[in-house]
């Protein structure tokens, strides 16, 4: 009886660890929405935006890489909302995105990627789903987030080996090409 309990506990812990590793995606993104410049609006849409963007970045499987939780790429998406229209759900924002990685054989991190995007503009409805389909780029917010996710991953891989992120950076370039059809000036 005791052996059976030990065996059950052992198998359960193995399954839990396997599930945790299999679920781990490439990014560990922290998303912050700064809406100080926007007044007279309900905060629900901003909270929903922050939650959905965080889930989208962290839960999406961007590549075929298999990473453990501690190997995820640390990144920050700081979105400053300059204007918001609740009539057409449009956001005019500035994005500051950064990623960092551990310095080899050290205990500290260094910045691998940093970019300020003054034209981070999109439409977002509070209950809409963010879904990435590489073969059909039809949502501005999803395209922007996917572009930056691929940039972060590609550059991170480049820091580990020369041209190591080329394939992933090519995916970012494909999004730029597809983004031309979205009628937002930032892609041109």
Residue spans for each PLM region:
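Sec/Tat signal peptide C-region and signal peptidase I cleavage site
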Residues: 20-24
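Positively charged n-region of N-terminal signal peptides that target proteins for export
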Residues: 1-5
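Start-of-domain marker
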Residues: 25-92, 103
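Bacterial N-terminal signal peptides
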Residues: 8-18
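Acidic/His-rich structured neighborhood in mature extracellular/periplasmic domains
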Residues: 92-188
